[in-house]
């Protein structure tokens, strides 16, 4: 019985850690790097925070598609263009990048630190 408990604990730890790791093939960039990309025309800037968070404060040029709606609204994005994802801390945008990757998107970039690191 003790072995089963340890196996369960180890599996839970692995799943938890895996949830926080960036998806393979997703670029991680700083807020400094994204400031240069905001001016480019061939990128899609997506803020995955809630509509209320976005309404209270957002970066010009970013479109709001909340994480909870990314699967339903992914058709609004062009798979051929780079998708740059932003949230408050980088956690939700990381999850969004994993969801979009599963949906076949390959040009994905996550903003490390999100809005919290924006200056």
Language-model features: where?
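Flexible, polar/low-complexity N-terminal or interdomain linker segments that lie immediately upstream
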Residues: 1-44, 48-55
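Catalytic cysteine-centered active loop of the rhodanese-like fold, especially the PTP/DSP P-loop
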Residues: 71, 77-119
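Conserved beta-strand scaffold positions in the cores of enzyme catalytic domains, especially
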Residues: 28, 45, 62-64, 108-110
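Conserved functional loop/turn residues at catalytic and ligand-binding sites
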Residues: 42, 58, 66, 90-91, ...
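Extracytoplasmic/periplasmic/luminal assembly and interaction segments
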Residues: 52-86
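Residues at the C-termini of beta-strands that transition into short coil/loop
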Residues: 32, 49, 66-68, 112
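Small-side-chain structural scaffolding
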Residues: 34, 43, 48, 62, ...
